[in-house]
Amino acid sequence: MQLSLPQILSRRDWENPQITQYHRLEAHPPFHSWRDVESAQKDRPSPQQQTLNGLWSFSYFTQPEAVPEHWVRCDLAEAKPLPVPANWQLHGYDAPIYTNIQYPIPVNPPRVPDLNPTGCYSRDFTLEPSWLASGKTRIIFDGVSSAFYLWCNGQWVGYSQDSRLPAEFDLTPYLQAGSNRIAVLVLRWSDGSYLEDQDMWRMSGIFRDVKLLHKPEIHLRDIHIMTHLSPEFTSANLEVMAAVNIPSLQLNDPQVTGSYQLRVQLWLADKLVASLQQPLGTQAIDERGPYTDRTQLVLRIDQPLLWSAEQPTLYRAVVSLLNHQQELIEAEAYDVGFRQVAIHQGLLKINGKAVLIRGVNRHEHHPQTGQAIDEESLLQDILLMKQHNFNAVRCSHYPNHPLWYRLCDRYGLYVVDEANIETHGMQPMSRLSDDPSWFSAFSERVTRMVQRDRNHPCIIIWSLGNESGHGATHDALYRWIKTNDPTRPVQYEGGGANTLATDILCPMYARVDEDQPFPAVPKWSIKKWIGLPNESRPLILCEYAHAMGNSFGGFARYWQAFRQYPRLQGGFIWDWVDQSLTHHNDHGQPYWAYGGDFGDTPNDRQFCMNGLVFPDRSPHPSLYEAQCAQQFFQFSLLSTTPLVINITSEYLFRESDNEQLYWRIMLEGESVLEGSQPLNLSPESSQCYRLAEKLPTLNKPGQLWLNVEIRQPKETPWSPAQHRSAWHQWRLPQPLFSPSSDLTNATAHYAPQLQHNLQLQHDLQLQQDEQHIKVTYQQQCWQFSRQTGRLAQWWVADKPMLLRPLQDQFVRAPLDNDIGISEATHIDPNAWVERWKKAGMYQLQQRCLSLHVDHLSHSVQISAEYGYEFEQEPLLHSHWVYRFDRHGRMTIDVNVRIATSLPAPARIGMCCQLADISPTVEWLGLGPHENYPDRQLAAQYGHWSLPLEQMHTAYIFPSENGLRCNTHTLNYGRWTLTGDFHFGISRYSTQQLMVTSHQHLLEPEEGTWLNIDGFHMGVGGDDSWSPSVHIDDILTRETYQYQICWQYKV
């Protein structure tokens, strides 16, 4: 008997954790039901599939009870078109909500709010009589959030929840030739929402593909493919377990079941490698006999080509179901990779080799389409990861779109497949995992994931979920996986990352050398962890290096440890992409939004933006740091006479057959000697390369650097030709300096001019009155204020060059890492920004303590002392000595003394606002991208030139940005600065960055703001909620000195 809509809704299935589905078919790998072997082998589109993607009719209600009963049979008058797949919140209905830990609904499991946003979808489609003449028709929803009911032609079909796994239903009894109508009622909240508390945008709707699939009456029901390699990896067995759907009344009739045959053909491109055919049936399982609806086929393969992320060689297995006349009923096909995953002697090994995981966590996210991801976006992520030396990705924190795994198989990425389970907002987190009434809901999310995805070679580890504590359910599901798929290890971080439910120590945000002894679940340093008594598992960080905004400091320390300790086998960076959504302001202009921008409450503001790439996949500077730290070639300088380097390949399987070594000896950013040669390295091998017999003799003084890089001359499936995969730089010892005759002649030529300059001492003039001190040289005049003691103006030809005077700067626009977990409603006194606020660093009162002028024989010297205090407490003392010489240069020596009561400042430097705006910035120092004292592994010393706008890093949440470290020369327009300093140059002041909430709200200011730092604190990045700048990168001394030389070229 068909139930009415009110009767169905009255059961409130979405508030019953023991009801996760009605009439949903069992999980299995993706099916295509090809009707010819060639199409299956070549992976052609299957005529048995019909997409239902496109425009659907959509009506929105605030709660399911408000849906009119007749909607299941016909569209409502107010219905409007809505694309599928899509999140309805991005099409004007309801609002996306971003939260990290806290649930977006009151925590009362399994209850959810009565006001439960509901989307009513419907679509008509047409089926020919031939489609319905025989067989069965299924409908497959690849992803619907969070729960839904399905009707076909007015009749209720079923119910499902779990947003991230397919829901498949048999539509055969409800279909008719011609026009058909399906209706889907989607609930935003369900008891399943309590298991989906991931750190992400909470959105709803049919956000993955929908399609019809036609299967024969007798058809393949499940296929499980495993590869087993010999100890020497010289041969392999391909094991295929296949089950067939046969009517139950025929299962015990051997004449019926035995008439069906299963055939497996293994192809390598167009070459048939092996084939095996046998009838249905297994060996006797117990005293009642065998299975009659399934069989096991084993093919032996000699000298198989192995699959790895480095060499993702794929075979193609075609599984055919044949009738008693040997005619094909249907075929399914899967890519097969021969590879072995094992933990042996404390090491995770791929094909017998200990692997170093160069991993990243990735949410399915697109700034325009939210959680609806297309193939182009999937492929873009994979190519970028491969190009930046990633070899692994964790599906955080749910099973991904089915196409993701196929692409990872083909392009070569190791995958941690993770169940769609997180209960982070529960107290305790294990509240539900220890509750038997929730066992079914937990278990289906794990078992169905395994059943869908287990044929993919890219998946090397199963994960039981994320941040859900540790309960009896986890132990049970761990054992289920180990029984049903003994070919892969299982990891689970909950409960301390080292419970019996994990084969791998997989902590998150454990530090290299620092213990975090939390009472319940201590996080030891990763070096200490692997040395604990009776602990022999490998350690792979499931999350580390929190890349939130201007972050990622100290990342290189992890990689030093990974390479030093074999059982530290890498980790997964948090995370890949800034989870910002495109929003529009009142004028219709787009901008990248974060939590709260949609009026969503509760929200966790900008905590959704932790990516190595911006939402449009353009790189953060931290991406280059990851690329360099993770590069597969390591370099060492053995000698300089002759010039010899050693290169080690960290590839486990591939030869360096597409690599060219390029080297250059650089003098102050200019090449003086260079060369290239092919790189011929076997896996895991080292080789010495003799680059030159000796260092070149120089005809001018300067510092020599040796730059080496490895490029790939030919394009690959994942990279263009000349892709740079690795690089390094060394500072070389100073060679002999032998001035050339040209230089000698040049000196002689300019000697009269130099002599003339010596005679122009009267051009350096000094004027003083009660308000100002002026130093004049030719067309330039430096004007000091006696009141402030500061350089108030720099005149050139009576034109003012400064919009704001030159002064000390000790603060920066707070980084996310500086802010930590401090916000309006919660203050973390340990956060750097709170320590600086409490100390008064943002409200310093400056006083000029003294001002002295000396007119020397060849220069004018002005000495000034400044005191900085807060609430009458002296905090900083700054002593500046300005020297003006007869060449129009201003040299400043700065000495800063810091009170012992003051927390370490963010910077010791100076700033001013220049009147000039020049299109280009040139410098000799570290570059070309933004770098900071604890994030400069990827930067190289050289001569760089960039447009002014590219000197600003457009972090969505504005903060300190754009620094370039270890600079010796800066040229900006007619300005030249020399010394040993860091600098940042921008159209935005520190003050504007501090008070502006979004990048798009920044307004270019008049002129240019120039920040010159003698010293700058690191940015940190082990995590973003506790102080994570390493002690070596904190300004802890009591005194600091630096010197800058300024010149304006008139």
From Swiss-Prot:
This is Beta-galactosidase. InterPro entries: B-gal_small/dom_5, Bact_Beta-galactosidase, Beta-gal/glucu_dom_sf, Gal_mutarotase_sf_dom, Galactose-bd-like_sf, GH-type_carb-bd, Glyco_hydro_2, Glyco_hydro_2_AS. Binds 2 magnesium ions per monomer. The active site is at E467 (proton donor), E543 (nucleophile). Pfam families: Bgal_small_N, Glyco_hydro_2, Glyco_hydro_2_C, Glyco_hydro_2_N, LacZ_4. It catalyses: Hydrolysis of terminal non-reducing beta-D-galactose residues in beta-D-galactosides. GO terms for biological process: lactose catabolic process. GO terms for molecular function: beta-galactosidase activity; carbohydrate binding; magnesium ion binding. Mg(2+) 1 binds at E422, H424, E467. Mg(2+) 2 binds at N603. Keywords: Glycosidase, Hydrolase, Magnesium, Metal-binding, Sodium. Homotetramer. Na(+) binds at D199, F607, N610. Its cofactor is Mg(2+); Na(+). The lineage of its organism: Bacteria, Pseudomonadati, Pseudomonadota, Gammaproteobacteria, Enterobacterales. It comes from the Bacteria.
